[in-house]
Design a protein with these regions (language model features):
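Active-site beta3 strand of CheY-like receiver
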Residues: 46-57
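Alpha4 helix (beta4-alpha4-beta5 surface) of REC/receiver domains from two-component response regulators
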Residues: 63, 67, 88-105
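C-terminal output helix
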Residues: 91, 109-121
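CheY-like receiver
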Residues: 116-119, 123-148
Length: 148
């Protein structure tokens, strides 16, 4: 069964890039949200295996995303949440990691970022390590990720 992902990011371009990468690995983005309210509604209805959450989905500099993260973790404590951000805020990163985020990856994405993402997901979802499920031609996706 494919890994079911809820993708939360206010940028359509970033959602496209991340969705393409998840699908190349054999996963499925089952829902996308561009703000915290949409994300919480979808989280409660689509039952994802993983949430990929951008810190900047609210105008509060990450505080709204952290509050959303805490609500999700209180409702489903074992839910893996991967945080992505263009904000280099070490204290916020530490807060997410301390509270149980799978990891906190920085944008813009590079080929190395996608390799980190793949390794994290394979660790959490071993079925993604199957030899037939490979990151197919990630270079064009990585080029798109740094365009802008």
């Amino acid at each position: 069964m494919a890994m079911r992902v809820l993708l939360v990011d206010d940028s359509v371009m970033v959602r496209d890039i991340v969705r393409n990468h998840v699908e190349c690995m054999g996963g499925s983005v089952v829902a996308e949200a561009e703000n915290t309210m949409q994300a919480l509604d979808l989280f409660r209805t689509v039952n994802p295996d993983l949430v990929i959450l951008d810190v900047a989905v609210s105008q509060t500099g990450g505080i709204g995303a952290l509050a959303l993260f805490r609500i999700m973790r209180s409702e489903v404590p074992e839910m893996p949440v991967l945080v992505i951000s263009g904000l280099a805020l070490p204290d916020l990163r530490r807060s997410f990691i301390r509270e149980g985020a799978l990891d906190y990856l920085f944008k813009p994405f590079t080929p190395r970022t996608f390799e980190q993402l793949r390794n994290l997901l394979v660790e959490r979802f071993p079925e993604l390590a199957h030899p037939m499920i490979q990151v197919r031609n990630a270079a064009p996706i990585a080029r798109l990720a740094t365009a802008g």
